[in-house]
Curated annotation (Swiss-Prot):
GO molecular function: sodium channel regulator activity; toxin activity
Post-translational modification as stated in the protein's UniProt record: The glycine-PoTx is a non-amidated form of poneratoxin, with an extra-Gly at C-terminus. This loss of amidation does not alter toxin activity on Nav1.7/SCN9A.
Other information: The variant A23E has an 8-fold reduction in potency compared to delta-paraponeritoxin-Pc1a. The variant D22N/A23V, has an ~5-fold increase in potency compared to delta-paraponeritoxin-Pc1a.
Recorded superkingdom: Eukaryota
Keyword Hydrolase belongs to the record: no
Localization per Swiss-Prot or TrEMBL: Secreted
GO CC terms, sorted: extracellular region; host cell postsynaptic membrane; host cell presynaptic membrane
Protein name (Swiss-Prot/TrEMBL): Glycyl-poneratoxin
PTM-bearing positions, type Arginine amide: 25
Keyword terms: Amidation, Ion channel impairing toxin, Neurotoxin, Postsynaptic neurotoxin, Presynaptic neurotoxin, Secreted, Toxin, Voltage-gated sodium channel impairing toxin
Tissue-by-tissue expression: Expressed by the venom gland.
First-listed, main subcellular location of the protein, grouped into a coarse class: secreted
Length: 26
C-alpha cells in the first residue's frame, strides 16, 4: 500500500496537476 500512497501523493503535487491539465488541453 505504501508505494501506492507515495505515487498518489506525487500525483497530487501542483506541478503534476498543471502538467496533466496541459496534457488534457492539448
Amino acid at each position: 500500500f505504501l508505494p501506492l500512497l507515495i505515487l498518489g501523493s506525487l500525483l497530487m503535487t501542483p506541478p503534476v496537476i498543471q502538467a496533466i491539465h496541459d496534457a488534457q488541453r492539448g
